[in-house]
């Protein structure tokens, strides 16, 4: 261990974040590898170590002969201060080596508010921020993750972007980079070659111009770059890598358990949900393989909790059969199964009984909207009766805590829709009174609202975010309507949601705002204790840009969007059609009921009904 680090660790919170050495961490002999990759997560250890994508790609890269992938996380504020005072560069956990020793620096970016942390980590690593200032092949700075479906705010800082699922394209990119170093290519030569790999977007190979009103006028590829870059996906989940031997952290993390991915994609088509669109099409992992991964993961980690994870886990066709198959193992090993947020329209007593064998920590449902009209607008395809039936089932089975998630500011939302949230909570309370086994335990209902953030590649990508003042008015309206002590109301901070909306649909000009805000102290802005909206507003003012232009403006469907060179596989025509359906409160059936012609099946060689 570096002597400077030994002196620093006693002075920071949770020093285990920075020492590595965890069970199942991968160590290699530096003399036996030719490619070193610093796999960076622009948030803290506790968040990054919980990320399944990080676990998967860590294993994929380390399975390659001659490649050593090591982890790097954003330091907490106290650690950053100590690193800067000691002039100690940011380092990787496995070897403790500075990031400048690595050939590739790869960021996994799932949240726009992590953008400042990327700049901060580069600076802490003593790596030039701007891609144009990094003239050599190493270190190559790349990024992937769902937030990179609009990478334009980071275009000046990132050499290239990997779009979609990274298991295959990451291997191809590493091999190309090896070849480039071996044959002495220049960086421009490498980037031009990388742009020919499906799923690789090289921002520097696209020239962007703007109209006088600030909208994008043109996006012009050059040097043979494709006009549109389409995401990569895994075709066969049974042949894809799964991290059975995952790292067991040495300190508590957010998701400290086995995360078992049952399938990718989502059949539902909620119109606000970026993940639901960009992870299409649906691809299931076989039941037997899921069961095998569950058993082996518990054996290799010692975990006694397994989360059955997907965008909509209860839509996994053999879910009940999988639980049946795992029951003897779980009983013998005292392993509990848990599910994330549940669909209210397919929750059953049978499923609940299997979950009840573990810890009854409460159930979570996400109705998203307070009235059926608005649920139809967003294509939630869940009714109040569905929700109440599920709650009655849970209460009859002994559950006494329910969390309900909603959004405020959805397109077409009215005060009636807002007040409908309070009515839903009251109806759930009534369902408990009707169905609870033991009323002496009482009931805990938690209503949580977030501020709707329009995202690229969704049916609502053209919609405005409501103003901060209007959001806070609706929060106050709902708070006043929820008067019972048995219902707790939590709402999301408005300032961070506003900046998320700005960054999510930002263009390249946002890069100078991002850098200015970072220089003013925006480092860990995914955390409310570090976030300052005033800092960002000052940066916008200094750069001559208006944040409301990005967050609060309705876009014309004819407008060239900043991310128009990126395709998730879902066509723009389909997104427009879904938007028009939303304004008529017309729902679209799920993908298993009927193919709606979104285009995503073409990615796996299938057909789409138009």
Ranges and model annotations:
Residues 193-203, 311-316, 340-346, 409, ...:
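A glycine-rich phosphate-binding loop feature that marks nucleotide/adenosyl-phosphate handling sites
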Residues 40, 113, 295-403, 407-446, ...:
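Conserved SAM/AdoMet-binding glycine-rich loop
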Residues 1-31, 37-39, 484-610:
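Radical SAM enzyme core and accessory elements
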Residues 39-43, 61, 248-274, 298, ...:
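N-terminal pre-triad scaffold of radical SAM enzymes
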Residues 51, 252-288, 594-610:
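Canonical Radical SAM [4Fe-4S] cluster-binding loop centered on the CxxxCxxC motif
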